[in-house]
Amino acid sequence: MRRVMFLLLCLGTINLYAQVPELDPTSVVDIPYTDLQVCDRVAMKASTDYDALSDVEFALLCFVEENPVLSHFYSGNCSWYCGGQIDSVTASSALADRYAAEKAHDFSIVTAWVEGVEGNGVGEYLRYSFPGTCPRITTVLIHNGYVKNWDVWRDNGRVKKLLMYYNDEPYAILNLQDTMGLQSFDVGVLGYEDKDSAPAWSIKFEILEVYPGKKYEDTAITEIYFDGIDVH
């Protein structure tokens, strides 16, 4: 009887996933070959004491602000986040405090969320919670794996498939490429147009499959962030 119940559960899960659309990236933009930790330090210095930048630091900052990937993290350019609000980012587990859920949404390309269970992290998830007044989301952007440098990225696991939930209902499967680059997914329109009495809402990302790391079983995600409408 137990075996029959297990088979029925498996069949139900397969049928559920079969009804969920699969999405491939609409674009993948490579990370430029540069020292990302130096970029991080220069951007931090610019935010606190811009006039103290050296000529070399200023040149690096200009490069960063013009780069289609790095500008998301280190420039003051307008984006969905001019109006976008996130109440919390939580996770089912984390390897340690320095790999906590919020590291997947801290706008730093040298930190990451790393799941904390035994094995490769299949079934672990990140959940993003939004107030009802939040502008609507149309795009999910992902840096897959621990991208701060090549060795760390290669040694740790990366996500192959993410099951995306909207308000705890399966919404789409995101097929991620095995790359350090920025992957963009068009996900329709999420959130509420009429925000006066709109309830809070959420997006969850559950690991379905992974690309194994060369050295560790741990699976990492550097950033998941968003673009959308209803701003400016």
Model-found features: residue ranges?
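Trp- and acidic/polar-enriched beta-sheet ligand-binding modules for extracellular glycan
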Residues: 20-45, 49-55, 120-123, 146, ...
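Sec-dependent N-terminal signal peptides
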Residues: 4-14
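Boundary at the C-terminal end of the N-terminal hydrophobic targeting segment
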Residues: 16-18
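Disordered, acidic Ser/Thr/Pro-rich linker "stalks" and the adjacent N-terminal cap
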Residues: 20-129, 154, 230-232
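Exposed beta-strand and adjacent loop surfaces of beta-rich binding modules
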Residues: 86, 137, 159-161
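A short, local hydrophobic-aromatic micro-motif
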Residues: 87, 138-139, 201, 222
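Extended extracellular/luminal ectodomain segments enriched in beta-structured repeat modules
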Residues: 121-123, 132-141, 200
